[in-house]
Amino acid sequence: MERSYNMKKTTTTRQVLPHVRPPRLAAALLLAVCCASTLVAAPERGELVACRIETDRGVVPADKPETAIVKVTLAADRVASRERPPINLALVLDRSGSMGGEKIARAREAAIAAIRRLDGRDMVSVVVYDHEVETLVPAQPARNSEWIEGRIAQITARGNTALFAGLSQSASELRKNLDTGRINRAILLSDGLANTGPSSPDEVGRLGAALMKEAIAVTTIGVGTDYNEDLMTRVSGNSDGNSYFVEKSDDLPAIFTKELGDVLSVVASRVRLTVRFRAGATPIECIGRDGRIVDNTVTVDLNQLYGGQEKYLLIRVELAPGRDGETRLLADAEVNFEDATSRRSAQATAAGRIRFSRDAREVAESVNVPVSREYTLNRNAQELDRAVRLADEGRKEEAARVMRESAGRLEAAARSLDAPELEIEARRQNVQADSIGSRGMGKAERKLIVTDNYMLYNQQSK
């Protein structure tokens, strides 16, 4: 039997960009910590991607069924910039009428700054859209930067928003260089609702899923408070790209710089993680990522891994009763990927075990605080998603109640895990719940929640 789950994703470190809204604390709490439940395969010199398995507790109670949270982490090594793979980049820029003034000026500035970070190995194209689509710069080597920058400088705002058509055209430009060993990325910028052509999150999301199959990741950048954050995060999520909410257009250059830093640090592509659980362990739910569960095997596909960053998957697992003192093989993980520089296929593996005990103290002392905290934060994010849906339906009091109840669970976890950061997050969430309960959820507030949750679910750095 096959079960699919679309839940969602955190980062080892969070860097606050100049003038960009500070990250919600929840999104910055990942720690690289090993405990008794971990068989560590940390990246070593010459090892491109390492895999490791952890559980929320290294020891669980014996003689009865139990539930465990399994975390499978992929850690990518850093690669010197001179060794990086070439880039196949498409900039997809909204030039509709609402982008007038400072927005279009900052978008031009950010696009030009992005071009200047590329070199002669890289390919670049620029597509602009309003109610029509124009390929301003057909795919070509980035060394033609002076002419490309001149074309970008001519962009002016006008018309409506044919977002789907603009993204589709950018994919056509990227396809001209798909088989050249380059890292494929479209950066889609918009400040408004798609109102020409396909415009629903499902329709545009399907395009993102199709591009994922071609190893094209789509990063979305929403400017202001009038764009559709559900649509933008859907297309990014389905293609394994990043997503940003930029409240002030002045922040666009910093966001483009951050995004190009990610693209230029890709070390692995076409990544498939397979986790096979042993007898006595049944995977029930993927928490935070799109995961496919077939019998006792979980599979997740990622488009790319960035050097120096970690991506992980949380899986809720049911355990058959174990005897006191028994150590059981829990799961085997295998990650297959393509080295982004050499284009050779590679693999990394890991195995995980868990122990059973009647000693309650031994169980309590085996708690893996980082894994438990990440699980708590992801569950809280899912509750915030539920609050957003309730607020959308006009049920603001219920939305506030969901947020307060989830904040209460954060407070309890803060005490049991000795994690004061969770207490701070709970207080912030309670204040937010009071505001939403009295006046509803504003557009900017909704975008913050949706985008922050996306970044948490996807381990996207800020």
What residue spans do the PLM features occupy?
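N-terminal secretory signal peptides that target proteins for export/translocation
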Residues: 1-21
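Bacterial N-terminal signal peptides
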Residues: 26-37
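Exposed acidic/Ser/Thr-rich ligand/metal-binding surfaces
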Residues: 43-47, 51-270, 319-325, 408-416, ...
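Hydrophobic residues positioned within well-ordered beta-strands of beta-sheet architectures
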Residues: 49-51, 68-70, 87-89, 271-273, ...
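Short aromatic-acidic-glycine turn motif
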Residues: 134-137, 278-286, 340-344
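A surface/secretory-pathway sequence property marking extracellular, secreted
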Residues: 272, 276-295
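Extracellular adhesion/glycan-binding regions together with long Ser/Thr-
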Residues: 287-310
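Long, acidic serine/threonine- and proline-rich intrinsically disordered regions
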Residues: 311, 319-462
